[in-house]
Amino acid sequence: MNIVGQKIYDWAVDLFPINRSLSGNGVRQTLQYIKNIIPELEVNEVPSGTKCFDWTVPQEWNCGDGYIVDPDGNKICNFKANNLHIVGYSIPVDKEIELEELIEHLYYLEDQPTAIPYITSYYSPRWGFCLSFNEFQKLKKGTYRVKIDSELKDGSLTYGEIKLKGRIEKEIFLSTYVCHPSMANNELSGPVVTMALINFIKLLKDRKHSYRIVFIPETIGSIAYISRNIDDMKKNIIAGFNITTIGDDRNYSYIPTRYGNTLSDKVSKHVLQDIDYVE
């Protein structure tokens, strides 16, 4: 692994344990980590309830702990062991229930029996736990204690932005997501590679184009950002790329624009044809 690759990997290792979501302290902690490496990053907050076109910024969610205690006293689905165990945006709960009721709040993947699924419920208040199908099959009848120490409150959605000026005002737009918890490909691959790209762009001595780069929560973060910057974006952006799920061992790929012949499309095809692009 080269020096840049090692740095990218080290950043991912540091960021992996953080519990990120659409909002909350995990996103702030992630952006602060990035800012420590890239001081030019500006962190912005959009208050809960803010109208963004026909969407509304949701309440802020934070989770401190969560687990299930089985009939034998064993603690399972422990949030502190793996933050994927808690359904994202779960409402708080602390009660004893029977297995039959518990099952209604459990999520697993039969076709991937060792995997813990990633489940969220951003806009429908509920609580739930995620576990591997192998662990699910071990559950037996009896009384279980379920506890999720979470909080939903009016707060804000957080995103980071950096602008790198070039000789002209026309911009290349890059975005990447910072809202998934402990997942490497879908999502951390995007932010850490984007960090490396920023460092590379900063070293270019004669940049023709300017660059606008954002670290945002998926969907609502994009909508919130565009709603606040639409005039500048329409005026200056000539190409844009969303950098996500680029950490697996499959071929590089891109999703074409609706038109198929924009500058973004042409650049992507030109670059990918020299790597592993197949028409």
Language-model-detected regions and their locations in the chain:
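N-terminal hydrophobic/helix-forming segments and targeting peptides
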Residues: 1-279
